[in-house]
């Protein structure tokens, strides 16, 4: 079983790296780009075959280590 975790900055938090990427893309001719927000994508292979228990464990991982819940949001998908 695999957990896929997406971590992004909360909308209220400035994303200077995303702003630089956005400006750079505009400079390269991609004029339709309005805004970029950069985040993290994490895949975790899990031995547990119980989807509910696996998601609970990954939720704990996110709260304890993978994300800074003060400035970041995360989503978890078990596949």
Which residues does each predicted region cover?
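Short glycine-/aliphatic-rich beta-strand segments at the starts of folded cytosolic domains
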Residues: 1-11, 40-43
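Solvent-exposed beta-strand sheet faces enriched in polar/charged residues
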Residues: 6, 36, 45, 77-79
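A generic structural motif
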Residues: 9, 48-50
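Short amphipathic alpha-helix segments
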Residues: 12-28
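Short, conserved charged micro-motifs
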Residues: 14-16, 50-56
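Short amphipathic alpha-helical segments enriched in hydrophobics
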Residues: 28-29, 69
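N-terminal glycine-rich anion-binding loops that anchor highly charged ligand groups
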Residues: 31-37
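C-terminal structural segments of small proteins and small subunits
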Residues: 55-79
């Amino acid at each position: 079983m695999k957990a896929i975790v997406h971590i992004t900055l909360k909308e209220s938090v400035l994303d200077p790296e995303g702003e630089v990427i956005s400006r750079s893309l505009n400079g390269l001719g991609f004029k339709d780009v309005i805004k970029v927000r950069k985040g993290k994508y994490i895949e975790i292979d899990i031995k547990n075959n119980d989807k509910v228990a696996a998601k609970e464990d990954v939720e704990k991982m996110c709260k304890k280590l993978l994300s800074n819940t003060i400035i970041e949001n995360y989503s978890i998908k078990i596949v």
